[in-house]
Amino acid sequence: MALVVKGKVNINEFIDLTKMEKILPSMFTPVKSVMCSKVDKIMVHENESLSEVNLLKGVKLIDSGYVCLAGLVVTGEWNLPDNCRGGVSVCLVDKRMERADEATLGSYYTAAAKKRFQFKVVPNYAITTQDAMKNVWQVLVNIRNVKMSAGFCPLSLEFVSVCIVYRNNIKLGLREKITSVRDGGPMELTEEVVDEFMEDVPMSIRLAKFRSRTGKKSDVRKGKISSSDRSAPNKNYRNVKDFGGMSFKKNNLIDDDSETTVAESDSF
């Protein structure tokens, strides 16, 4: 008798995309493709075992990309007569994690009297494609008080996962843009201009403080632009900074009529 997950796996039980994410083109969202894996099986012969499981079986991965294990459906079948005593605990494990409490992703207990069972796990985290190819997930099975002779299989387990495969984590849309370029300004952003502009970025401030504690001077301190090299601030914009003929305006979204460079598509 073949073991199958009855019906189709309902992806909506694991992934809730917003309306905006559904209509945006792929370049504006890291979600590239949602896939269901092929079934992987474990035939349990021992009372306690830790077995490798391929949760990405049949999933097409992207080179130098990521895969998110959004959800997992586990189906089990007891290969026993009716009304047998005992039970089993099934636990999904991420073998990369060294602390046991952090490696445990979810567990389930059921009695042997329940001939067939099914449960869902929602790990909902991503790993790199390189890690995924190393088959990082395992299943810990602990059968208790089931009296069967050695060498036989009291329990069969099958696994189907829902995965999100994508190339980049970055989302386009939140950008700084050049609003104007005047005569006499530099043809490119020099290191000094970039350093001073980055002073307004919170993470840059944190990095500067960290480097000062370790005795390393930030390049921002080494090369300040003289006041004669700077253009007068544009008072019409509150959040505008001018650097040698280029003015930057902080903006949450790129206007449709502005010149932008579109990032490389993550299609495959």
From Swiss-Prot:
Q: Where in the cell is it found?
A: Host cytoplasm, Host cytoskeleton; Host cell junction, Host plasmodesma
Describe the function of this protein.
Transports viral genome to neighboring plant cells directly through plasmosdesmata, without any budding. The movement protein allows efficient cell to cell propagation, by bypassing the host cell wall barrier. Forms a ribonucleoprotein complex with viral RNA. Binds microtubules and modulates microtubule stability. Can bind double-stranded DNA. Triggers host hypersensitive defense reaction in incompatible plants harboring resistance (R) proteins.
Q: Which organism is it from?
A: Tobacco mosaic virus (strain OM)
Under what name is this protein listed?
A: Movement protein
What are the start and end residues of every segment in region (Disordered)?
A: 218-246
Describe, as the record does, how this protein assembles with itself and its partners: Binds to host RBCS at the plasmodesmata; this interaction seems required for viral systemic movement. In resistant plants, interacts with host MBP2C at host microtubules; this interaction prevents virus cell to cell movement. In resistant plants, interacts with host resistance (R) protein (e.g. tomato ToMV resistance protein TM-2(2), AC Q71BG9) at the host plasma membrane; this interaction triggers host defense responses leading to programmed cell death.
Q: Which family does it belong to?
A: Belongs to the tobamovirus movement protein family.
A GO molecular function held by the record: double-stranded DNA binding
InterPro entries given for it? TMV_movement, Viral_movement
Which key words tag this protein in UniProt? Answer: Cleavage on pair of basic residues, Host cell junction, Host cytoplasm, Host cytoskeleton, Host-virus interaction, RNA-binding, Transport, Viral movement protein
Q: What processes does the entry annotate via GO biological process terms? A: transport of virus in host, cell to cell
Disulphide-bridged cysteine pairs: none
Q: Name one GO cellular component term.
A: host cytoskeleton
Top-level taxonomic group: Viruses
Q: Where is the composition biased (Polar residues)?
A: 225-237
